[in-house]
């Protein structure tokens, strides 16, 4: 049973520390995840939620106020 706990902890840490894939779909479009209330200018730079976390949306870099 201890082995299962150790295995689970190891797998959890392995996925938690995986580098470079956070919000990959948004970054491929040239954007970053911003708070949902942010206005993206021009509107074509607002990609919506995509793979951003809850209450955030993907906007093109350097857009909005």
UniProtKB/Swiss-Prot annotation:
Its main location: secreted. This is Myotoxin-3. GO terms for biological process: envenomation resulting in occlusion of the pore of voltage-gated potassium channel in another organism. It comes from the Eukaryota. Belongs to the crotamine-myotoxin family. Monomer. One of its GO terms (molecular function) is potassium channel regulator activity. Keywords: Antimicrobial, Disulfide bond, Ion channel impairing toxin, Myotoxin, Neurotoxin, Potassium channel impairing toxin, Secreted, Signal, Toxin, Voltage-gated potassium channel impairing toxin. The keyword Ribosomal protein does not apply. Transmembrane segments: none annotated. Disulfide bonds join 26-58, 33-52, 40-59. Residues 1-22 form the signal peptide. It is found in: Secreted. Expressed by the venom gland. The keyword Signal applies. Cationic peptide that possesses multiple functions. It acts as a cell-penetrating peptide (CPP), and as a potent voltage-gated potassium channel (Kv) inhibitor. It exhibits antimicrobial activities, hind limb paralysis, and severe muscle necrosis by a non-enzymatic mechanism. Gene3D superfamilies: Anthopleurin-A. It comes from Crotalus durissus terrificus. GO terms for cellular component: extracellular region.
């Amino acid at each position: 049973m201890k082995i299962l706990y150790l295995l689970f902890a190891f797998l959890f840490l392995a996925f938690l520390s995986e580098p470079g894939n956070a919000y990959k779909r948004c970054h491929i479009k040239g954007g970053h995840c911003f708070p949902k209330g942010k206005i993206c200018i021009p509107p074509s730079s607002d990609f919506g939620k995509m793979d951003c976390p809850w209450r955030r949306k993907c906007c093109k870099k350097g857009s909005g106020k």
